[in-house]
């Protein structure tokens, strides 16, 4: 079983990593190509391109300027420990033990606008580049064109290596759009998390994002190898709803926490 996650906008490079184990990203050459393009933009242009504030644009212009094709413990941090958004609050990688980290490294992949695909322990230099950014490049008008089939082929390689029964999609629509399900060598299962509010079940963004991280952590904690085992996920009051699910979309619902 292979799980894919989205990255996070917020990063934590201040907290020391609790493990020295790391790997290098597979697509440093491609990342360098994107960095070269991004360095041509002023902070004002970055603010417009990414629809972010001027201070954030300046921060990221400095990040792009400092980016190096050489990844070290000084300029980088393991991706799963550097990301710090809602998903990663649920994942809580900083409290994972060696066995759980090893599971994550084997069974989880993080989709990234700059790095394409990251293993959880791949060293990552700080950046902000969302997959939906319309950054023109030699391959086309945006990052989906830039990455082409690369991400799908990389996932297929891992699927073949571990003889995965399915790809579990815990990423957002924006990020999973870089994956081409028709070319994948395993079916895609997408867990959906809903909360009861105002008389109906609905997706509440913060809770749904956090639940994706919780499910990835659940898989690592239990050492899950088969997707069917995820139906037992019961963290924070969520339960699998068979009646509302189908082969491709698995519904997990709860009536508490709101």
Swiss-Prot record:
This is UPF0246 protein mma_1385. Pfam families: H2O2_YaaD (PF03883). NCBIfam families: PRK02101.1-1, PRK02101.1-3. Belongs to the UPF0246 family. GO terms for cellular component: cytosol. GO terms for biological process: response to hydroperoxide. Signal peptide: none annotated. It comes from the Bacteria.
């Amino acid at each position: 079983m292979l799980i894919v996650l989205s990255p996070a906008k917020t990063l934590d490079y201040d907290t020391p990593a609790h493990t020295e184990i790391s790997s290098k990203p597979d697509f440093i050459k491609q990342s360098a190509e994107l960095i070269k393009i991004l360095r041509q933009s002023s902070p004002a242009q970055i603010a417009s391109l990414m629809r972010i504030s001027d201070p954030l644009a300046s921060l990221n212009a400095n990040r792009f300027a400092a980016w190096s094709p050489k990844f070290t413990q000084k300029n980088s941090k393991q991706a799963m420990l550097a990301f710090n958004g809602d998903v990663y609050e649920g994942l809580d990688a900083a409290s994972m033990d060696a066995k759980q980290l090893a599971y994550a490294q084997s069974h989880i992949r993080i989709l990234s606008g700059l790095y394409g695909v990251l293993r959880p322990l791949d060293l990552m230099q700080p950046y902000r580049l969302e997959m939906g950014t319309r950054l023109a490049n030699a391959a086309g008008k945006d990052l989906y064109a830039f990455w082409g089939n690369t991400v799908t082929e990389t996932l297929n390689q891992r699927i073949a290596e571990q003889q995965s029964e399915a790809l579990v999609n815990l990423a957002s629509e924006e990020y999973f759009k870089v994956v081409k399900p028709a070319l994948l060598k395993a079916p895609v299962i997408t867990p959906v998390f809903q909360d009861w509010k105002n008389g109906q079940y609905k997706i509440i963004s913060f809770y749904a994002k956090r639940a994706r991280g919780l499910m990835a952590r659940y898989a690592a904690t239990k050492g899950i190898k088969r997707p069917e085992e995820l139906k037992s996920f019961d963290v924070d009051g969520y339960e699998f709803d068979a009646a509302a699910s189908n082969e491709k979309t698995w519904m997990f619902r709860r009536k508490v926490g709101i």
